[in-house]
Amino acid sequence: MNRLNIAVSCLATALLFGCEALHPPAPGDNPDYAPTYPVTPDPKELRKVSGAIYSSETALPLFETPRARHPGDILTVYLIEKTDAQKNATTTQRKNDTTKITNKLFLGRPISLGSGYSMDFDLDNQRQFNGEGRSIQNNKLAGSISVTVAKVLANGNMVVQGEKWVRINQGNEFVRLSGIVRPQDIKADNTITSDRIANARISYGGTGQINNTNAQGWLSRILWGPLFPT
C-alpha cells in the first residue's frame, strides 16, 4: 500500500509539473505597464478667484514644443533593437603516461620468479578529451509604441511605461515597454528611439493558437522537468 501511495504521489507531482503553464498575458494585467493619466484639478480649486487672469491649472504653452514633460503626457518610442552575439569555445586535453621496468635488481643481484615468469612489464596510459561549443544568436525588433509619463524624477528625467496590443487573426501580439527618458533626448516631434532609454524593459510576445503551437505539450514538460534532469 505504501508503494502504491508513493507511486500515486510521484505521478501527481509529475502531472503538476507537466500541466503547469504560465497564465497568458492580458491587457492591463501588469501595473508596471499601465497607462498614467493626468491629474485632474479639483473643480473647487478652479473656482477660486485670485484676481489674476492666468491659471496654472488651465495654462496652455504657446512657445514650447509639444514634448512630454508631465505625468500622463504621451511619448512615441521607435523600437530599433538589434543584437548579434556569437561565442566559440574549444577545449582539448591530452595526457600520456608510459612506465617500463626491466633488469630488476635487488642488492645488486637479479630477481627471478622462476622459469617461465618474468618481472618485466610495460605500462602505457593515454587519456584524451575534446570539447567544442558554438552559439550564435541574432535578435531584431522594429516598430513603434506610444507610452505615457508615469513619474518625473528629481533631476528631470521621466519614467515612462506603456503597452500596445494588436489582434491578428486568432491571436494577439503585444509590445510592452518601460524605462527612464532624458528630456534632452526627446526630439521636436515628441519621439525618441529605444536605444536612448535607460533601464529599458522591452517585451514582445503573443497569445492565441499560433503562439501555443510553439509551446511544449504537457508530456514534454514532464520529461524536461526537474523530475527528469539531463
Curated annotation (Swiss-Prot):
Lipidation feature positions (S-diacylglycerol cysteine): 19
Keyword Chaperone carried by entry: no
Record flagged with keyword Membrane: yes
Domain of life: Bacteria
Cellular component, GO annotation: bacterial-type flagellum basal body, distal rod, L ring; cell outer membrane
Molecular-function GO terms, alphabetical: cytoskeletal motor activity
GO terms, biological process: bacterial-type flagellum-dependent cell motility
Lipidated positions per record (N-palmitoyl cysteine): 19
Matching PROSITE patterns: PROKAR_LIPOPROTEIN
UniProt subcellular location: Cell outer membrane; Bacterial flagellum basal body
Residues spanning the signal sequence: 1-18
InterPro entries: Flag_Lring
Keywords, in A-Z order: Bacterial flagellum, Cell outer membrane, Lipoprotein, Membrane, Palmitate, Signal
Membrane topology term: Lipid-anchor
Pfam families: FlgH
Family that this chain belongs to: Belongs to the FlgH family.
Subunit structure comment from the entry: The basal body constitutes a major portion of the flagellar organelle and consists of four rings (L,P,S, and M) mounted on a central rod.
Protein purpose: Assembles around the rod to form the L-ring and probably protects the motor/basal body from shearing forces during rotation.
Protein name (Swiss-Prot/TrEMBL): Flagellar L-ring protein
UniProt gene name: flgH
